[in-house]
């Protein structure tokens, strides 16, 4: 027999909700569970492909990489000019 007042309340008919729609019921310690993805809308389980826009990330990386390389070359040029003047 479990001790009283130490165990969470068990909800045998807890609702799993995705995008405002009840997708299934299960047992849980919360009456409602909000989820973003479930097997009914996940591309792996539905067989659909979702194209991700990664171009923005690549562009951001390339800009950062170019800036870092151009900044470092400018700094090297400045430091070599300062050494020549001394």
UniProtKB/Swiss-Prot annotation:
Q: Where is this region: Disordered?
A: 65-86
Give the source's domain of life in one word: Bacteria
The answer to whether UniProt assigns keyword rRNA-binding to this entry is: yes
Where are stretches of biased composition, namely Basic and acidic residues? 73-86
Q: How does it assemble?
A: Part of the 50S ribosomal subunit.
So what does this one do?
Binds the 23S rRNA.
Q: What is this protein called?
A: Large ribosomal subunit protein bL31
User: What organism, scientifically named, is this protein from?
Assistant: Prochlorococcus marinus (strain NATL1A)
Name of the encoding gene: rpmE
């Amino acid at each position: 027999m479990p001790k009283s007042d130490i165990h969470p309340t068990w909800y045998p008919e807890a609702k799993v909700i995705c995008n405002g729609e009840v997708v299934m019921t299960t047992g849980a310690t919360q009456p409602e569970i909000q989820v973003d993805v479930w097997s009914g809308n996940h591309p792996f389980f539905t067989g659909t492909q979702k194209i991700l826009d990664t171009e923005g990330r690549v562009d951001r990386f390339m800009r950062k990489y170019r800036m870092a390389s151009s900044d470092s070359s400018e700094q090297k040029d400045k430091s070599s000019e300062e050494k020549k003047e001394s």
